[in-house]
Amino acid sequence: MLETLRERLLSVQQDFTSGLKTLGDKSREAKKSRQRTAQCSPEFSAGLELLSRYEDAWAALHKGAKDCAKAGELVDSEVVMLSAHWEKKRNSLVELQDQLQQIPGFLADLECLTASLARLEANFEEMETHLLCLEDLCEQCELERYKCVQTLQLENYKKTKRKELENFKAELDAEHAQKVLDMEHTQQMKLKERQKFFEEAFQQDMEQYLSTGYLQIAERREPIGSMSSMEVNVDMLEQMDLMDMSDQEALDVFLNSGGEDNNMLSPMLGPDSSTYVNEISLQVPSQSELRHKLSSLSSTCTDSASQEASEGESPVVQSDEEEVQVDTALAAVAERKGASDVSDESDSQTI
């Protein structure tokens, strides 16, 4: 449409210029013909009228041509502006058409991008799970390392405590061995003292028996020193079973019980026991039997003395009369102790 309008404007312009040229040519021909006619018989009035009429027509045509030229220039400028504007529009339309043609490819690329984004999301989720697993593994490794450190510390602590325990046991064993040696030494001393005491008592009884011919215990002789406690301790040692001396608590209980029993037995072997002992009397044997017993007792006493010197823990040989006295005294003490226990139980129940 614009091209046809431009072609028309160009054709009008060409026609206008060709018309102006033809008018100029005609005016020249008219001048030439006037000159020719003037030579013949010029009529100045008619020529003047024709000239004025042609000049007026020419002036009007020239003015119209100028107006048309100006209007054509305006139209040409507007047409140029319109052509530039429409050229821009056409370029934009072409670009829009190209973009519209590229829409399917863009949609395909967009679908590919969405698929790749979905794959990336899945990969990110998987990576997150792997990172969580790695974090758990790192925590487990830290925990195992901490456990190893703690176990090493515990082993070192156990070793130190075991060494301390071994040292403490060694000290206790040494102390216990020393106490056992001291106790054995004291027991040996007590046994020797008791043996000496019984030998003296036996010699006195034998002298009385040989001089009088009979043996009657009138009263209980007073013990020399702390012989009552020694007798009770030896009797208890003879009655008790063997214990494991490695146990310190059992040793303490044994020593405490021995001291308490000594304290209990020493006051009880007083006038009450002497009443029971005073009633004991022995029948007088014959002279042959007496000599036989004396020889046997002397041999046994010498044997026991030699054994005590070698071993230090063998029991002392006693006479029959002394055994009877000790047994009766112990029986009386046991009866009184049982009665006191019963009374204590009754008192505790009443309380």
Swiss-Prot record:
Residues 295-306 have a biased composition (Low complexity). The keyword Membrane applies. It is found in: Cytoplasm; Cytoplasmic vesicle membrane; Cytoplasmic vesicle, Secretory vesicle, Synaptic vesicle membrane; Endosome membrane. Residues 291-325 are annotated as: Disordered. It comes from the Eukaryota. GO terms for cellular component: axon; axon cytoplasm; BLOC-1 complex; dendritic spine; endoplasmic reticulum membrane; endosome membrane; growth cone; melanosome membrane. InterPro entries: Dysbindin. One of its GO terms (biological process) is actin cytoskeleton organization. Transmembrane segments: none annotated. Component of the BLOC-1 complex, a complex that is required for normal biogenesis of lysosome-related organelles (LRO), such as platelet dense granules and melanosomes. Plays a role in intracellular vesicle trafficking. Plays a role in synaptic vesicle trafficking and in neurotransmitter release. May be required for normal dopamine homeostasis in the cerebral cortex, hippocampus, and hypothalamus. Plays a role in the regulation of cell surface exposure of DRD2. Contributes to the regulation of dopamine signaling. May play a role in actin cytoskeleton reorganization and neurite outgrowth. This is Dysbindin. It comes from Gallus gallus (Chicken). The lineage of its organism: Eukaryota, Metazoa, Chordata, Craniata, Vertebrata.
